[in-house]
Amino acid sequence: MEAEFSRDGISLRRYQVADIPLLYEAVRESISDISPWMPWCHSDYSMEDSKAWVISRDEAWVNEVELSFVITDAQTGAFLGAVGLNQFNRDHQFANLGYWVRRSRARGGAATTATLLTARFGLRTLGLQRIEILAAVGNRASQRVAEKVGAKKEGVLRNRLSLHGLPHDAMMYSLIAADLNV
């Protein structure tokens, strides 16, 4: 299964052991931006957390539990963030798509391009019928990414996310093959 893609100066690839310190650096740089929406990103995030995550990616991929990609600058190879498909529903052929981009590269289009590439991979290569993107109601940056790739806003799901132990409403977006001409 193809696992590397590029478009508009952005590349996606699977995690490698060499990404451990790069992931750590990107997360530490971005805690204040990402932490409200992704509880795994917290002030105590450590190099060991990065190592555990990167090491777990191969097994998650093989078992098709979560297909995770590193977002890189296609020219320099710089680590920009991550994107992936998870929460697969095999009976109904859909999955969740999530993403984050490091603070120093936010608002540069990396998340949008990575989301588009990953959605196409899910719909075309994996044969999914639907990709879902959930964004906390207060997470406008994530909502903008979903809207830029053409995801359809389906509404607010009450108490759909648990962030830092508290329930939060989420905006539900979806993509199907027709939305992306796949």
Show the residue positions of the predicted features.
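Acyl-donor (CoA/ACP) binding surface of acyl/acetyltransferases
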Residues: M1-L22, A26-D33, S68-V182
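Conserved GNAT-fold acetyl-CoA-binding loop/helix
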Residues: S35-S56
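Short, polar/charged, Gly/Pro-enriched helix-capping and turn/loop motifs at alpha-helix termini
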Residues: W37, C41, E64-S68, Q129
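Intrinsically disordered, low-complexity regulatory segments enriched
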Residues: H42-Y45, D58, E66, R105
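A short hydrophobic/aromatic micro-motif that marks alpha-helical segments and, especially, helix-coil
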Residues: Y45-S46, W61, L180
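A generic secondary-structure signal
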Residues: S56-R57, F121
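Short loop/turn motifs at secondary-structure junctions and domain boundaries
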Residues: E59-E64, A151
